Amino acid sequence: MIIKPKIRGFICTTTHPVGCEANVKEQIAYTKAQGPIKNAPKRVLVVGSSSGYGLSSRIAAAFGGGAATIGVFFEKPGTDKKPGTAGFYNAAAFDKLAHEAGLYAKSLNGDAFSNEAKQKAIELIKQDLGQIDLVVYSLASPVRKMPDTGELVRSALKPIGETYTSTAVDTNKDVIIEASVEPATEQEIADTVTVMGGQDWELWIQALEEAGVLAEGCKTVAYSYIGTELTWPIYWDGALGRAKMDLDRAATALNEKLAAKGGTANVAVLKSVVTQASSAIPVMPLYIAMVFKKMREQGVHEGCMEQIYRMFSQRLYKEDGSAPEVDDHNRLRLDDWELRDDIQQHCRDLWPQITTENLRELTDYDMYKEEFIKLFGFGIEGIDYDADVNPEVEFDVIDIE
């Protein structure tokens, strides 16, 4: 079929398999060009490995460190009627390219929150790898099915205490609007912590530990975002922030647990990037368009792959083998360049000046749109989007259920 982009709200409902593979190839090429990561882990499990930072983590481990990787994700394959999810095509492309490079790669598709996912992963590790040296936790899901009761819990992208009103961009109409978001209820806050906090990360590590598949010196890392006062009301000071604080709590508990085997647990605070997750957060697209422009001008802009390569090579697995620098909460900070005073001051000054008329001139809004559509495999140079493509790609993926 011939596949064109169809945007609805903040998601693109179609995906292009050839474009998704091109994205994965681009990240692999970047990683290889940087050179091998010294002291890299050799057996890596990535929970949430099909897009964004999770996918980049799998690429860094495999193509930067030569690691055997197992990826866990929840994605839909294509059928003869419609394309699959971008994550499915990303994961399929990764597997194919890893195998071509002579690397071990196996993937589990299903609900990563489930007990079954953990058991399947453990069986696979025992069967093929013995143990794991690094566990990356990179799940971004709006819903969690509780593993023991089957109850569905939903997260809320809402402020706490009062209605939040701010300038934002309507990405469908490309106009500046005033966006208002009602505050979260106590129940919504608790639910957001349940879905996006650290509990499932702890359950993964506990299951792996009890099964004896965590190697001596095993590290684990989970990803977070803190941002700045421009986004704090909706993010760090909102329901989502409570969940991210719970991730910090989990990291502290896991760090104590893993210390016995010479291991560590850290939250890595990453920069804002264009992902399906961030596009759903009011205010984020406009903030990203602003901060990207300034960071590009300063030569410090990074996408997912650049961030994760830097995290592996300059934080978790430093060349001299020394412990990584951390902040007061034992977090690895990779948002250091984004949070530079000159960059943030620029955004603060610019924010009130943005109008529909000057949006494209004062920010990297067009670049934001390009990166967004690229997530789904569109707008990539060298791909013929009028050509017939097969939405059903070959992928020897293991179904969890």
Curated annotation (Swiss-Prot):
Binding residue positions for NAD(+): 48-53, 74-75, 111-112, 139-140, 244, 273-275
One of the GO BP terms on file: fatty acid biosynthetic process
Catalysed reactions, as listed in the record: a 2,3-saturated acyl-[ACP] + NAD(+) = a (2E)-enoyl-[ACP] + NADH + H(+); a 2,3-saturated acyl-CoA + NAD(+) = a (2E)-enoyl-CoA + NADH + H(+); (2E)-butenoyl-[ACP] + NADH + H(+) = butanoyl-[ACP] + NAD(+); butanoyl-CoA + NAD(+) = (2E)-butenoyl-CoA + NADH + H(+)
Activity regulation, per record: Weakly inhibited by triclosan.
EC number: 1.3.1.9, 1.3.1.44
Catalytic residues, chain numbering: Y235
A Pfam family reported for this protein in Swiss-Prot or TrEMBL: Eno-Rase_FAD_bd
Annotated keywords: Fatty acid biosynthesis, Fatty acid metabolism, Lipid biosynthesis, Lipid metabolism, NAD, Oxidoreductase
Binding site for substrate: Y225
Site feature: Plays an important role in discriminating NADH against NADPH: E75
Keyword Lipid biosynthesis: yes
Pathway: Lipid metabolism; fatty acid biosynthesis
Function: Involved in the final reduction of the elongation cycle of fatty acid synthesis (FAS II). Catalyzes the NADH-dependent reduction of a carbon-carbon double bond in an enoyl moiety that is covalently linked to an acyl carrier protein (ACP). It can use both crotonyl-CoA and crotonyl-ACP.
Family the entry assigns: Belongs to the TER reductase family.
Subunit structure: Monomer.
Full protein name: Enoyl-[acyl-carrier-protein] reductase [NADH] 1
